[in-house]
From Swiss-Prot:
Example GO biological process: pyrimidine nucleobase catabolic process
Stated name of the protein: NAD-dependent dihydropyrimidine dehydrogenase subunit PreT
Family named by the database record: Belongs to the NADH dehydrogenase family.
Protein function: Involved in pyrimidine base degradation. Catalyzes physiologically the reduction of uracil to 5,6-dihydrouracil (DHU) by using NADH as a specific cosubstrate. It also catalyzes the reverse reaction and the reduction of thymine to 5,6-dihydrothymine (DHT).
SUPFAM superfamilies in alphabetical order: alpha-helical ferredoxin (SSF46548), Nucleotide-binding domain (SSF51971)
GO molecular function: dihydropyrimidine dehydrogenase (NAD+) activity; iron-sulfur cluster binding; NADH dehydrogenase activity
Reaction(s) catalysed (UniProt annotation): 5,6-dihydrouracil + NAD(+) = uracil + NADH + H(+); 5,6-dihydrothymine + NAD(+) = thymine + NADH + H(+)
Amino acid sequence: MPQQNYLDELTPGFTPLLAIKEASRCLLCHDAPCSQACPAQTDPGKFIRSIYFRNFKGAAETIRENNALGAVCARVCPTEKLCQRGCTRSGIDKPIDIARLQRFITDFEQQTAMQIYQPGSKTRGKVAIIGAGPAGLQASVTLTHLGYDVTIYEKQPQPGGWLRHGIPAFRLPQSVLDQEIARIVEMGVNIKCNCEVGGSLSLAQLKAEYRAVLMTVGMSCGSGLPLFEQASHVEIAVDFLQRARQADGDISVPRSALIIGGGDVAMDVASTLKILGCPSVTCVAREELAEFPASEKEFTSTQALGVSIIDGFTPVAVSGNKVTFHHVRHSGELTLEAENIILAVGQHARLDTFAEIKAQHNIIDTHNYQTDDPAIFAAGDIVKGDKTVVYAVKTGKEAAQAIHHYLEEACSC
């Protein structure tokens, strides 16, 4: 098996012939379950039908009508839990590979320089968005389509949020994200980077300048465990992934690594370590396989790289480079030793700089995405719901519609 490069995509894309062949397996359901199961309403049933009839531009238009990050979602969305899970073809052999078909179309869109999005009219006034992650980017597109002049404030040097700083390049190449964002900027969305709201620029200042403000700050801070507070050779998963991404994978790796956690972030850490040359990588999760939080796609690809995954154990003691685990249901005990220990046990947002907003456990309580302040809305990871990219797209789109409804009502008073 050839060595996987950090910058090369792990999963190959479809050629036109393979895409048409895969689309031809579709049963062309009248009321397609796959379309009903997509949180972003990307409508796989419709774009697969277009591919089947060789109408690639029509397929791209269907995707972009509902999902400004179609190329991103095609690569990182847990489709086996969503649209592919609803595929009727599963009852015959296996579901349609919806993710790769969507990736083929969005790649074709870029390769042929399709112009699907048009600049917005900017006739309805100004709206500010805090955070240029998936929720903020999608909201900016929806608001621009509705006629608003949108400015996104992003604290990092480049937009993208977790898409840029956390997801490994072999899952999401930077060029793909750059192309998605360039398309959004061409619509007329203004993105101001290196501009953190909550410091010299306050939420109150934005409220004074804009008709509405949407908060889409992500959960970019990694969580730790009290057990490991005094331990050496311990790193938070978010920090490790950011280091690897910023260096294009050019970082040193240990001879052995122990990852604690069982979600997609843990799988990304484990896969990154193996791809960068770490000989021994073990991942231990407290969840048992039947309830594993990682997507099947991530879990399978991580195992294929040679990562050892142990389920059902939780850490109870640490001594130097050794960690002792107890089984969550049985009396079993396990002790593992590794040069480095990486904690992938959750993430949280930094909301303490937004004193005006009430938040509990890093979640902002909203009613239809509206906070206690009627002119301030929230979407993405900081509202209740799933923490995947496709759900961020969903909340960004719905929050934009809620803002539009609020401003329309304000004008009619």
